[in-house]
Protein backbone atom coordinates (compact mmCIF):
# COMPACT_ATOMS: atom_id res chain seq x y z
CA UNK A 1 0.00 0.00 0.00
CA UNK A 2 2.86 2.41 0.75
CA UNK A 3 4.17 1.94 -2.80
CA UNK A 4 0.83 3.18 -4.15
CA UNK A 5 0.87 6.21 -1.85
CA UNK A 6 4.47 6.94 -2.86
CA UNK A 7 3.45 6.75 -6.53
CA UNK A 8 0.51 9.11 -5.95
CA UNK A 9 2.78 11.58 -4.18
CA UNK A 10 5.38 11.42 -6.95
CA UNK A 11 2.95 11.71 -9.87
CA UNK A 12 0.89 14.52 -8.37
CA UNK A 13 3.99 16.40 -7.17
CA UNK A 14 4.69 17.11 -10.85
CA UNK A 15 1.56 19.27 -11.09
CA UNK A 16 2.48 22.92 -11.38
CA UNK A 17 0.16 25.60 -10.08
CA UNK A 18 -0.31 28.93 -11.81
CA UNK A 19 -0.22 31.89 -9.47
CA UNK A 20 -3.53 33.68 -9.44
CA UNK A 21 -4.91 36.72 -7.77
CA UNK A 22 -8.48 35.58 -8.38
CA UNK A 23 -9.39 34.39 -4.89
CA UNK A 24 -13.07 34.10 -5.88
CA UNK A 25 -12.20 31.46 -8.49
CA UNK A 26 -10.15 29.53 -5.92
CA UNK A 27 -12.97 29.71 -3.37
CA UNK A 28 -15.51 28.55 -5.96
CA UNK A 29 -13.30 25.60 -6.86
CA UNK A 30 -12.93 24.62 -3.18
CA UNK A 31 -16.71 24.84 -2.71
CA UNK A 32 -17.24 22.69 -5.80
CA UNK A 33 -14.81 20.01 -4.58
CA UNK A 34 -16.49 20.05 -1.15
CA UNK A 35 -19.89 19.58 -2.79
CA UNK A 36 -18.58 16.64 -4.83
CA UNK A 37 -17.07 15.14 -1.68
CA UNK A 38 -20.41 15.40 0.14
CA UNK A 39 -22.12 13.60 -2.76
CA UNK A 40 -19.49 10.86 -2.93
CA UNK A 41 -19.73 10.22 0.81
CA UNK A 42 -23.52 9.98 0.86
CA UNK A 43 -25.68 6.88 0.64
CA UNK A 44 -27.22 8.40 -2.52
CA UNK A 45 -24.01 8.70 -4.52
CA UNK A 46 -24.40 7.30 -8.04
CA UNK A 47 -20.81 6.21 -8.67
CA UNK A 48 -19.63 9.05 -10.87
CA UNK A 49 -16.02 8.69 -11.99
CA UNK A 50 -14.70 11.88 -10.39
CA UNK A 51 -11.08 11.43 -11.48
CA UNK A 52 -12.21 10.52 -15.01
CA UNK A 53 -14.15 13.78 -15.19
CA UNK A 54 -11.09 15.76 -14.05
CA UNK A 55 -8.81 13.80 -16.39
CA UNK A 56 -11.00 14.41 -19.43
CA UNK A 57 -11.23 18.13 -18.64
CA UNK A 58 -7.47 18.49 -18.21
CA UNK A 59 -6.80 16.47 -21.37
CA UNK A 60 -8.88 18.83 -23.48
CA UNK A 61 -5.88 21.15 -23.33
CA UNK A 62 -3.24 18.54 -24.20
CA UNK A 63 -2.26 16.89 -27.46
CA UNK A 64 -4.21 13.75 -28.34
CA UNK A 65 -2.81 10.59 -26.80
CA UNK A 66 -0.70 8.48 -29.11
CA UNK A 67 -1.42 5.37 -27.05
CA UNK A 68 -5.08 5.27 -28.03
CA UNK A 69 -6.31 5.66 -24.46
CA UNK A 70 -10.03 6.24 -24.24
CA UNK A 71 -11.89 6.91 -21.01
CA UNK A 72 -15.37 5.50 -20.73
CA UNK A 73 -18.24 7.93 -20.16
CA UNK A 74 -20.58 7.36 -17.21
CA UNK A 75 -23.58 6.35 -19.31
CA UNK A 76 -21.52 3.55 -20.89
CA UNK A 77 -20.28 2.21 -17.54
CA UNK A 78 -23.88 2.21 -16.29
CA UNK A 79 -25.04 0.38 -19.41
CA UNK A 80 -22.26 -2.22 -19.17
CA UNK A 81 -22.97 -2.83 -15.49
CA UNK A 82 -26.61 -3.60 -16.32
CA UNK A 83 -25.73 -5.58 -19.46
CA UNK A 84 -23.47 -8.07 -17.68
CA UNK A 85 -25.93 -8.32 -14.77
CA UNK A 86 -23.46 -7.79 -11.91
CA UNK A 87 -24.76 -8.48 -8.40
CA UNK A 88 -23.43 -7.60 -4.95
CA UNK A 89 -21.90 -11.10 -4.69
CA UNK A 90 -19.87 -10.98 -7.92
CA UNK A 91 -16.18 -10.24 -8.31
CA UNK A 92 -15.25 -7.60 -10.87
CA UNK A 93 -11.95 -7.47 -12.78
CA UNK A 94 -11.10 -4.59 -15.10
CA UNK A 95 -7.88 -5.63 -16.85
CA UNK A 96 -7.35 -2.18 -18.40
CA UNK A 97 -8.96 -0.04 -15.72
CA UNK A 98 -7.79 3.42 -16.78
CA UNK A 99 -9.17 5.94 -14.28
CA UNK A 100 -11.22 3.20 -12.61
CA UNK A 101 -14.61 4.19 -14.03
CA UNK A 102 -15.98 0.64 -14.29
CA UNK A 103 -14.69 -0.26 -10.83
CA UNK A 104 -16.20 2.88 -9.29
CA UNK A 105 -19.55 2.19 -10.98
CA UNK A 106 -19.54 -1.47 -9.93
CA UNK A 107 -18.56 -0.59 -6.36
CA UNK A 108 -21.31 2.00 -6.09
CA UNK A 109 -24.05 -0.25 -7.45
CA UNK A 110 -22.93 -3.33 -5.51
CA UNK A 111 -22.84 -1.35 -2.27
CA UNK A 112 -26.30 0.10 -2.96
CA UNK A 113 -27.63 -3.44 -3.48
CA UNK A 114 -26.01 -4.58 -0.24
CA UNK A 115 -27.76 -1.96 1.89
CA UNK A 116 -25.50 1.08 1.61
CA UNK A 117 -22.06 2.27 2.63
CA UNK A 118 -22.54 1.34 6.28
CA UNK A 119 -23.51 -2.29 5.63
CA UNK A 120 -21.17 -5.14 6.57
CA UNK A 121 -21.15 -6.31 2.97
CA UNK A 122 -19.83 -2.92 1.77
CA UNK A 123 -16.44 -3.57 3.37
CA UNK A 124 -16.23 -7.01 1.75
CA UNK A 125 -17.07 -5.56 -1.65
CA UNK A 126 -14.29 -2.98 -1.32
CA UNK A 127 -11.72 -5.41 0.10
CA UNK A 128 -12.10 -8.56 -1.98
CA UNK A 129 -14.53 -8.16 -4.86
CA UNK A 130 -13.00 -5.39 -7.01
CA UNK A 131 -9.78 -5.79 -9.01
CA UNK A 132 -8.13 -3.41 -11.45
CA UNK A 133 -5.00 -3.53 -13.59
CA UNK A 134 -3.49 -0.57 -15.45
CA UNK A 135 -0.25 -0.43 -17.42
CA UNK A 136 0.32 3.34 -17.69
CA UNK A 137 1.97 4.69 -14.54
CA UNK A 138 0.21 8.07 -14.49
CA UNK A 139 -3.18 6.56 -15.29
CA UNK A 140 -2.61 3.93 -12.60
CA UNK A 141 -2.05 6.79 -10.13
CA UNK A 142 -5.31 8.32 -11.35
CA UNK A 143 -7.17 5.04 -10.71
CA UNK A 144 -5.65 4.79 -7.22
CA UNK A 145 -6.70 8.35 -6.44
CA UNK A 146 -10.19 7.73 -7.83
CA UNK A 147 -10.74 4.61 -5.73
CA UNK A 148 -9.28 6.36 -2.68
CA UNK A 149 -11.67 9.29 -3.14
CA UNK A 150 -14.52 6.80 -3.26
CA UNK A 151 -13.39 5.19 0.01
CA UNK A 152 -12.07 1.97 -1.54
CA UNK A 153 -8.50 2.38 -0.40
CA UNK A 154 -7.21 1.17 -3.80
CA UNK A 155 -6.75 -2.27 -2.25
CA UNK A 156 -6.73 -4.45 -5.34
CA UNK A 157 -5.26 -2.20 -8.02
CA UNK A 158 -2.03 -3.27 -9.70
CA UNK A 159 0.26 -1.56 -12.18
CA UNK A 160 0.91 -4.38 -14.65
CA UNK A 161 0.79 -5.08 -18.37
CA UNK A 162 -2.05 -7.52 -19.04
CA UNK A 163 -0.65 -8.09 -22.52
CA UNK A 164 2.44 -9.83 -21.14
CA UNK A 165 2.59 -13.45 -19.98
CA UNK A 166 4.19 -12.64 -16.61
Residue ranges and their predicted role:
Residues 1-60:
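Long recognition/docking surfaces used for binding and targeting
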Amino acid sequence: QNLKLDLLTEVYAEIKMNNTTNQDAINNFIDWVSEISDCVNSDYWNGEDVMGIFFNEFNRYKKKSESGQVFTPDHITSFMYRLIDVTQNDRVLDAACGSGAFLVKAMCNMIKESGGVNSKKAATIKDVQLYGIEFDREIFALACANMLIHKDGKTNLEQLDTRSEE
